């Protein structure tokens, strides 16, 4: 009887996480790429946007769905001399174990570590985990981990001049999944 009750509770609790109200699963996960992918713009000397597909990802997620607690937005306006800079930051709230794993990657100063963010196994966007002390530039999505937060920038500020270009971070599939699992905080 005890085994049956334990098994029933185990089924209830393991199925409760990552599901929407109608029972469909909705998983957001982050994978490190198996190998380095080249920039889409091969003339670009800095790291920049790249393409990856499902076969470029390992079997196990680097950051699992249950480690993603929430997703928030932050907008800062910085005035410097005659210029105005707008920082539209998006942030994952994660477990400290997730940020510890990122910070233990020993990310090189020059080039970051490529990752892919997925929803239900489909790649939503790709980017780089970046070293906090790096002064190198990056023309692609860049992520920094600290405390229990991963800041996701469209590009590093020194390279984010194209106001009119598409922001891959603003993805309705990602936001719908986070909203359905009560993790989207605007």
Protein language model regions, located:
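Structural signature of multi-pass, alpha-helical inner-membrane proteins
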Residues: 19-186
């Amino acid at each position: 009887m005890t085994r049956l009750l334990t098994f029933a509770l185990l089924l209830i609790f393991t199925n409760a996480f990552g599901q929407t109200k109608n029972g469909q699963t909705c998983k957001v996960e982050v994978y490190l790429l198996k190998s380095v992918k080249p920039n889409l713009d091969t003339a670009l000397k800095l790291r920049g946007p790249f393409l990856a597909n499902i076969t470029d990802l390992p079997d196990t997620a680097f950051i699992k769905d249950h480690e993603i607690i929430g997703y928030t937005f932050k907008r800062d306006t910085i005035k410097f001399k005659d210029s105005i800079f707008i920082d539209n930051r998006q942030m994952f709230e994660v477990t400290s174990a997730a940020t510890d794993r990122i910070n233990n990657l020993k990310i090189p100063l020059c080039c970051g570590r490529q990752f892919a963010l997925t929803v239900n196994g489909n790649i939503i966007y790709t980017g780089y985990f970046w070293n906090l002390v790096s002064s190198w530039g990056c023309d692609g999505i860049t992520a920094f981990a600290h405390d229990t937060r991963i800041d996701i920038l469209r590009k590093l500020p020194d390279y984010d001049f194209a106001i009119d270009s598409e922001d891959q971070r603003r993805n309705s599939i990602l936001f719908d999944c986070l909203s359905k699992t009560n993790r989207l905080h605007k």
